[in-house]
Amino acid sequence: MTAFIPPYPKRHEKEINPFQALYYARNDLLSMWDEDAFKMDFMSQKILKQHVFIANSPDIIRYVMVENKDNYERKSPQMKRALEPLLGDGLFISDGKTWASRRRIQTPMFDNAHIQMYSKTISSTIVEMADNWQAKGNDTIIEVHTEMAKLAAEIIARTLFGEKLGAENSEAVVSAFADYQSVVKQMALSNFLGLPDWMPNVNAKIGKAKRAGQTIHNAVDAIIALAEKGGHEGTMVDELIKANQSESGIDLMTRKQIRNEIIVLFMAGHETTANVLAWTWYLISQSPDVEKKLHQELDEVLNGRVPEYSDIENLKYTRAILDETMRLYPPVPILSRQALKEDEIRGKKIPAGSLMLVVPWLIQRHQKHWENPDHFIPERFMPGEKKPKKFTYLPFSAGPRVCIGKSFGITESVLAVATIAQRFRLELPAEAEVKHECRLTLRPKGKLPMIMKIRS
């Protein structure tokens, strides 16, 4: 079996200087790395007046994300400014006591019992989409990334707000998110470099972000108002409102803060999953042996029935495909933190205010930690294989700030791949050229058309 090597940005033969880095990063933050970046443990660069450090070994990543987490807890000020118009002080960008309180309130919503409850909505939404595909007929061209985005948005909307409210409002909210994402894309370089907010170009983009964020706020506020009228028991918004009640009867969060957390859940719950699923179908389409093994597993475990939550533990190869997809295409390819106080790592002084980057794109393709790191080999994640060294695989981040929705995302993705792959094959047209786009998340660039084949 010859493993597929998906295309990736050209790597520079030697380290590029700060001005070259700026040039390449204008359009793609993943095109600025040289070959040595996939071999080295710790790197530093001074870009303009900003000190930038890259933690690129398991021990340093552990130090930054766990052992000295309090010093590297905070997102960069510029990243906060980019996301605050949308998320306010939501879980994704808060820190300190605010973050700890929000995390504590929401953690029970993502325990196994709740995920199993949500899985019924997840499964029915996937089946509904698959039925719509079936009705289109064999050899229909499916724009896969758009379809996966719609699916993930429907799932999180229905899980958050209930079947009726979610179905009626997901499209409007997703459209508003797309507008916001286009602004964030323009801000990616300034966020990464920590350019000051007073710079005209940066300031103008922050203004655009605020206007786009307000559109989303209005849409979500309207949905919450309807949800509060009752009849939405078992939804995430209902669980969040209940969890917000303290024993003394005093609300732990304001209405505005609840809205912020709902937006965080919606944003994190549809964007990353949609991207992972789109990349998964692309990789499967280029790997006939992988597809054959996937179909064999689905036939053996499911025998044509719709997968349920209890099946997930037996869909080991399906899960391995997703794990390998997230290794090659990490949902969030660059994690940025700010050093609050001066520090020292491996003899290098880390000035207060420096950017400390943990880059899943690098560590998950690092030549010290992965054999054939650029190859698509799901078998490396199968039971019995050597497990990846801790802190070399970070699709959901790591440490105390590991993604709260990790189990939800895995459940959703496994059920989606199992349900869809049982009924369809997706073929990439010969003329199609697949490229990536690095925003806050890593997604296919432009459209991803695939030919839908109904399995007999």
What are these regions (language model features)?
Residues 2-10, 32, 72-80, 98, ...:
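Cytochrome P450 heme-thiolate monooxygenase catalytic core
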Residues 358-386:
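Conserved cytochrome P450 K-helix/beta-meander segment immediately N-terminal to the heme-binding cysteine loop
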Residues 58-59, 361:
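Alpha-helix/helix-capping structural signal
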